[in-house]
Amino acid sequence: MRLPPFQELLDRNREAVYRFLVAAVGHQDADDCFQETFLAALRAYPRLERADNLRGWLLTIARNKALDHHRRQPQHPIPTDPLPEVAAPAADPDHTEVWTAVRRLPPKQMSAVIYRFVNDLPYRDIARLLDCTEEAARRNVHEALKKLRGATYE
């Protein structure tokens, strides 16, 4: 399968990638991570050999950029107070305590929750993006939700 022009790839996937980044890093830093994501994709695009699952490829790059962003941030203590119930997926990912807590989850759990509830991906696709089994993807989401409901952080 031939690769589409890069601009077409950008146009088709812009919203999904941006939603993921807003949930992963917040509105304030999403624009920078979005630009870094598509610059990295643009550099790698000519070397890409297959055109299957391009959205997954872009979301993987976005996930890596979000993780890089978190690594550059100063570490904050993890709150020990119980968290409110998990917000609906439509909740603004930049203005709730829940989404702040989501961003503090271990990287695979954070990504799994965002892929599932922001990008509405099936577990099969989440497993492919996280390079794990479908059962491990389900477990990552389950464990993350357990932590968000007030279980103690590891």
Q: How does the language model describe each region?
A:
Residues 1-8, 18-36, 45-52, 134:
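Short, charged helix-capping/linker segments at alpha-helix termini
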Residues 4, 77-103:
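Acidic, proline/glycine-rich intrinsically disordered inter-domain spacer in sigma factors
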Residues 46-50, 60-80, 91:
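Arg/Lys-rich amphipathic alpha helix in sigma70-family domain 2
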Residues 63, 67, 130-154:
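DNA-recognition helix of helix-turn-helix
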Residues 112-116:
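A short pre-motif secondary-structure segment
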